[in-house]
Amino acid sequence: TIADKVTIDGRFIDLKRYSEEETKVLMLNKQAGVICSNKDEEGRKSVFDFLPENTRWVMVGRLDLNSAGLLLFTNNGDLANKLMHPSSEIDREYAVRVLGRVSDEDIKQLISGIELEDGFAKFHKVTIGGGDGANRWYHVVVREGRKREVRRLWEALDFKVSRLIRTRFSDIRMPDNLRANQSELLKPKQVQSLLNSVNLLP
């Protein structure tokens, strides 16, 4: 636009070069056993090993060592902070494989809430995902990013989580064809949707 083009002392200046960097968001399909820290004394693989190196990426939340699935990274620190803040109430959906027979009463309790050591927590939604025998899959939604929150809610009712995979963050779903430890940039309209969800301008 004309506003982006000015002349100073007869020299053409492109203001776009000096404007704030365009917001980028990257999704990664984290594999279980990969850490979310930048450095590790044990030499284990980090999620940062699988990211493009030409950008300073900020991780949006984290997944524990034994969890897998969708992780988001952005070059916009404000966006990362707002997406992580509990007041934003952003949906995080997980596929969870649970060992043990879960009753309707158990599900009601998980939705109504349980007092954990760091305060009250609950699932906003629980749906059955299938499975046979003692191991069954469930899809659960939380709106906070507390450490090991999904596992701790199940463990509070004496159930063991044998697998935990994040499948969705806000309205961003992990594509079926995104392989383990593979990353992919979000499309501009997906980035805009995330910015809108926390009332940030692009």
List the predicted regions and their residue ranges.
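Basic, flexible Lys/Arg- and Gly-enriched helix-loop patches that mediate nucleic-acid binding at interfaces
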Residues: 1-202
